[in-house]
């Protein structure tokens, strides 16, 4: 899966290009992001293009969260479509992973993290 990777200061911003995050691409999504993280432990997933996510896609997001959490960091989501947000809320992912309306809000939320 193609993922646009950008740095904003010490925050890695990853934007999945595909409209679906599911069984067909979740492993490559997870691999690309974890490979790009390096020593970075602040991750924003910009979900602006994602229209659908299934359990494997949620698992990939959780895997990325575990990876950054193990390094003392965090993962934030932004620009999540209503259908995707419903799935994330159904599995209660929004309780362990903050969701922001915009990329800037998500990036700014890291200001208090070392």
Q: Residues of each region from the PLM?
A:
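STAS-typified acidic loop motif
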Residues: 2-31
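Non-catalytic signal-transmission and effector/linker regions of two-component phosphorelay proteins
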Residues: 1-4, 112-114
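General small-molecule cofactor/ligand-binding pocket signal
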Residues: 4-6, 78, 100
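Amphipathic alpha-helical interaction surfaces in cytosolic regulatory modules
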Residues: 23-97
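Short, charge-rich amphipathic segments
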Residues: 1, 37-38, 43, 102-106
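Residues that form or immediately flank small-molecule/cofactor binding pockets and catalytic motifs
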Residues: 8-10, 82, 104
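A charged, well-structured terminal subsegment
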Residues: 99-114
């Amino acid at each position: 899966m193609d993922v646009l990777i950008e740095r904003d200061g010490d925050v890695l911003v990853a934007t999945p290009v595909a409209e679906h995050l599911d069984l067909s691409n979740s492993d490559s999504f997870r691999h690309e992001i974890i490979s790009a993280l390096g020593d970075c432990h602040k991750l924003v997933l910009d979900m602006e293009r994602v229209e659908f996510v299934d359990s494997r896609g949620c698992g990939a997001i959780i895997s990325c969260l575990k990876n950054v959490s193990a390094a003392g960091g965090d993962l934030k989501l932004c620009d999540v479509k209503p259908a995707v947000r419903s799935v994330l809320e159904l599995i209660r992912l929004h309780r362990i992973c903050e969701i922001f309306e915009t990329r800037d809000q998500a990036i700014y939320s890291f200001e208090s993290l070392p």
